[in-house]
Amino acid sequence: MTSPMGPTARDFWQNSRNSATIQRLIVSPMQTTALSSDLNSTYTPGEAHGHHGHPDLRMFGVVLFLVAESAIFLGLFTAYLIYRSVMPAWPPEGTPELELLLPGVNSIILISSSFVMHKGQAAIRNNDNAGLQKWFGITAAMGIIFLAGQMYEYFHLEMGLTTNLFASCFYVLTGFHGLHVTFGLLLILSVLWRSRQPGHYSRTSHFGVEAAELYWHFVDVVWIVLFILVYLL
């Protein structure tokens, strides 16, 4: 009851309690809706941070793996350059001259495959699963052609692994890279196999696609460095 002299402190306290209760009743559903929206929001792979998302630790793991692989190749390239600098002649006398035509064509095929593969990722970002399958299928075919060209080169080279130091370096570097191309092909084929299931990849869920593409780009960059060091210098 309000005093004839006006509202008392108790009245103010009671009114404040009622006002706070009303505010809680109004705000609580709004907060619940926002929280539900956060929980139901789908993180899009490829974005380091979303509006409500967090870093994708799976992609972080892929990047760490590629950093480790880069360190291995860096060690191999460094060893190759050291051997080259300390030898009186490089390649050593008697080493068959490497042909540039086939490796050059192979390089164009492998580098072009990265652009083709990116079209596949762009397709799935538009929920175009058929486009993903088409472009990744072409990329796989280009990777197989690259490996076939490399095997053809091996069979027609007039030197073996133990011919001399240059031959050993050549086979180790190109062979190790070839293993990485093979692994990249397996990743691409895995994506193609999984894409047969409707809805497995979509605009908001395509981590496997991005991981395979990132690995393939890594393989391409390594080949460019290898081609320059071994074939051109």
From Swiss-Prot:
Keyword Isomerase attached: no
Reactions performed catalytically: 4 Fe(II)-[cytochrome c] + O2 + 8 H(+)(in) = 4 Fe(III)-[cytochrome c] + 2 H2O + 4 H(+)(out)
Entry EC no(s): 7.1.1.9
Membrane-crossing residue ranges in chain numbering: 62-82, 98-118, 135-155, 172-192
Iron found in the keyword field: no
GO biological process: aerobic electron transport chain; aerobic respiration
Compartments, record wording: Cell membrane
Matches recorded under InterPro entries: Cyt_c/ubiquinol_Oxase_su3 (IPR024791), Cyt_c_oxidase-like_su3 (IPR000298), Cyt_c_oxidase_su3-like_sf (IPR035973), Cyt_c_oxidase_su3_a-hlx (IPR013833)
Protein name per the record: Cytochrome c oxidase subunit 3
Organism: Synechocystis sp. (strain ATCC 27184 / PCC 6803 / Kazusa)
